[in-house]
Amino acid sequence: MYEVILKRFENPDEVRTFEKGKFELVRLGGMTIGRATYEPGWKWSLHVGQGARSCMVEHIGLVVSGRATAAMDDGRVIEMKPGDVFYIAPGHDSWVVGNEPYVSLHFMGAGQYAQNKPK
């Protein structure tokens, strides 16, 4: 039997909130997809990692709006903008660039990201 499942981020299965941002999750077909929404001034090491140097979650995603930087532990730095499809290996920090909120969809790593944050 074939099945169709429709979900929307307006009614997510889970929301992980933290200062200056949130990460909404939908689960379907054995997969977890996340939508990250970060306000200007958000930085992973300050607002999610709580002082940790690096995010150790592997990400594949798509930038919907805004801009963000990913800084790898080896010194490489990239800026992501709307329409970019990205892969980010473990061992990075990230922050919002500019005065516009940053929104991205995450197809890999969503289930592990910001797990210990209060709901």
Spans of model-derived segments:
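Short beta-strand segments in beta-sandwich/barrel cores
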Residues: 43-44, 66-71, 94
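A short hydrophobic beta-strand segment most commonly corresponding to one strand
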Residues: 35-36, 88, 93, 98-117
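Short acidic-glycine-tyrosine-enriched beta hairpin
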Residues: 73-92
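A short, N-terminal "cap"/entry segment at the start of jelly-roll beta-barrel domains
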Residues: 1-37, 45, 119
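Conserved GNAT-family N-acetyltransferase fold
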Residues: 36-38, 61, 86
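Short, acidic/polar N-cap/turn motifs at the starts of alpha helices
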Residues: 13-15, 22-23, 33, 58, ...
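A short local loop/turn or secondary-structure capping micro-motif enriched for an aromatic residue
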Residues: 42-43, 79, 112-115
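Glycine- and acidic-residue-biased ligand/ion/polar-headgroup-sensing regions
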Residues: 31, 49-74
